């Protein structure tokens, strides 16, 4: 069963923008998450100065095996994004409009 991770972030840098975060995600962090075993990852504009990253892994085991690397990416990302991690949670995907393998 797929495992979904959701992190929410708040921009704290004075010069960073959501476009800056988007560029970093596309260039560096999406490829990094996929290399760690993620099936898919998305960046979402949550509101004003906040954004969320939603990542789908094939299973909890795949995510758990990569958790140390994911933590390092989050720390590095916080600095590069000019944002602070507000919350991180995850769980088994129970249903989806898209077929999950």
Predicted regions and their residues:
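Short S/T/G/P-rich N-terminal loop/turn motif that feeds into the first structured element of a domain
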Residues: 1-52, 56-75, 79-101
């Amino acid at each position: 069963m797929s495992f979904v991770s959701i992190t929410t972030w708040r921009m704290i840098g004075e010069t960073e923008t959501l476009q800056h975060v988007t560029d970093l995600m596309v260039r560096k962090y999406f490829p990094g998450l996929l290399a760690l075993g993620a099936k898919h990852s998305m960046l979402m504009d949550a509101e004003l100065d906040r954004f969320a990253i939603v990542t789908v892994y094939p299973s909890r085991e795949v995510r758990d095996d990569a958790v140390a690397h994911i933590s390092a990416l989050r720390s590095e990302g916080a600095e590069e994004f000019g944002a602070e991690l507000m919350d991180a949670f995850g769980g088994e995907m129970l249903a989806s409009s898209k077929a999950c393998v």
